[in-house]
Amino acid sequence: MSAPAQPPAEGTEGTAPGGGPPGPPPNMTSNRRLQQTQAQVEEVVDIIRVNVDKVLERDQKLSELDDRADALQAGASQFESSAAKLKRKYWWKNCKMMIMLGAICAIIVVVIVIYFFT
């Protein structure tokens, strides 16, 4: 008849099939995976927090930039209107000077004509 089954040798209870080194118990593997996943989740949450902070900071800077752009636009409009007024003012001054110069030249011509023809 056949020989009775031999009990396993001492120290071989946790060994992997094939006689390799013993593997961790299944409970330890799932705990390690859970810890790794939690660490990854915490890392992603930290990255998201940083990104949200950056977005809020960027929004604030854009708001400030928009306010400055509005103020600059208002200043540019005011400058444009005052420059147009100044241009008109000096155009009229120039016209007056030309009229005065023409009148003076006309008077000089009249004086010369009267002096030579009388």
Curated annotation (Swiss-Prot):
Gene3D superfamilies cross-referenced by the UniProt entry: 1.20.5.110
Look up the record and report any one GO term of the cellular component aspect: SNARE complex
Chain ranges on the Cytoplasmic side, renumbered to this chain: 1-96
Q: Share the record's PTM remark.
A: (Microbial infection) Targeted and hydrolyzed by C.botulinum neurotoxin type B (BoNT/B, botB) which probably hydrolyzes the 78-Gln-|-Phe-79 bond and inhibits neurotransmitter release. (Microbial infection) Targeted and hydrolyzed by C.botulinum neurotoxin type D (BoNT/D, botD) which probably hydrolyzes the 61-Arg-|-Leu-62 bond and inhibits neurotransmitter release. BoNT/D has low catalytic activity on this protein due to its sequence. Note that humans are not known to be infected by C.botulinum type D.
Looking up Pfam families in the UniProt record yields: Synaptobrevin
On tissue specificity, the annotation reads: Nervous system, skeletal muscle and adipose tissue.
An annotated Gene Ontology molecular function: syntaxin binding
Where, by residue number, does the polypeptide cross the bilayer? 97-116
Domain v-SNARE coiled-coil homology spans what residues? 33-93
Q: Which residues carry this modification: Phosphoserine?
A: 63
Keywords linked to the UniProt accession: Coiled coil, Congenital myasthenic syndrome, Cytoplasmic vesicle, Disease variant, Membrane, Mitochondrion, Mitochondrion outer membrane, Neurodegeneration, Phosphoprotein, Synapse, Synaptosome, Transmembrane, Transmembrane helix
Q: Where is this site: (Microbial infection) Cleavage?
A: 60-62, 68-69, 78-79
Region annotated Disordered, chain positions: 1-36
Which family, according to UniProt? Belongs to the synaptobrevin family.
According to the record's subunit comment, the protein's assembly and interactions are: Interacts with VAPA and VAPB.
Tell me the protein's name: Vesicle-associated membrane protein 1
Q: Which organism is it from?
A: Homo sapiens
Instruction: Please spell out the taxonomic lineage of the organism that makes this protein.
Output: Eukaryota, Metazoa, Chordata, Craniata, Vertebrata
